[in-house]
Amino acid sequence: MFRDLKPAYLFCCSVLYAFSVLRPSQGISVSTHHNLHKTVGSDVTLYCGFWSNEYVSDLTTLSWRFRPDNSRDIISIFHYGNGVPYIEKWGQFRGRVEWVGDISKHDGSIVIRNLDYIDNGTFTCDVKNPPDVVGTSSDVHLTVYDKIPPVGAGVVSGAIIGTFLGIILLIVGGLYLFRYIVRRRARSETSFLQRRRSAAERGKVSGKAGTVSKGPVLYATLDQSKSGKGASEKKSKLSESKRDKK
């Protein structure tokens, strides 16, 4: 039984050893712009950046290819290998391509000068950095115009809609602010009038209380004056009776 399991055991050990010692190739990532718009006679920089787990060496290769619009033909316009850039010396890009990248900085950019209508198409950047050889290339589409590229209908409609919505928001905000100010003023005026009314009512109540309290005082004063007159009359009568007796 154990003899039958020995080959399977050896196979598993060999697989584990291979995974632990041998490092599989990693995928390389390449990035470019998506769309570029230029005018006739101008220059364009085709950016190509890449990322790899491996160090850049002389084994690193980079290439640029071009496919014109409405065509399936693919034209090689640039190649980098063994640490040296190679620019194609024939075809429509002859004398117009310049290497401006730096492989050590993961930059594979080129410049195409004096653009023309025949340069409309898709440019593809492909990078290999062994053992990172698995990955996808990146494309950038170039459109060459006679003048400044016109603004798209979508951009114009978006700007109009955005402006219209902004005006509506400003109007609504202004109305809410106006209503808030009016309500605040009305509340302040109402509270002021209420304070005045309460003050007037308090003044009336205090005036009535003063008139009511003066009644007993007046009656007491009258009583005192009457009692004083009666006492003086009694005294005068007593003095007259004494005189008559004498």
UniProtKB/Swiss-Prot annotation:
Residues 179-246 are cytoplasmic. Residues 231-246 have a biased composition (Basic and acidic residues). Residues 1-27 form the signal peptide. GO terms for cellular component: plasma membrane. The chain crosses the membrane at residues 151-178. N-glycan is sulfated. Keywords: Cell membrane, Disulfide bond, Glycoprotein, Immunoglobulin domain, Membrane, Phosphoprotein, Signal, Transmembrane, Transmembrane helix. Residues 28-150 are extracellular. It is a single-pass type I membrane protein. Coiled coil: none annotated. Glycans are attached at residue 120. Disulfide bonds join 48-125. It is found in: Cell membrane. Residues 200-246 are annotated as: Disordered. Residues 28-143 form the Ig-like V-type domain. InterPro entries: Ig-like_dom (IPR007110), Ig-like_dom_sf (IPR036179), Ig-like_fold (IPR013783), Ig_sub (IPR003599), Ig_V-set (IPR013106), Myelin_P0-rel (IPR000920), Myelin_P0_CS (IPR019738), MYP0_C (IPR019566). Found only in peripheral nervous system Schwann cells. GO terms for biological process: myelination. Belongs to the myelin P0 protein family. Creation of an extracellular membrane face which guides the wrapping process and ultimately compacts adjacent lamellae. This is Myelin protein P0. The gene is mpz.
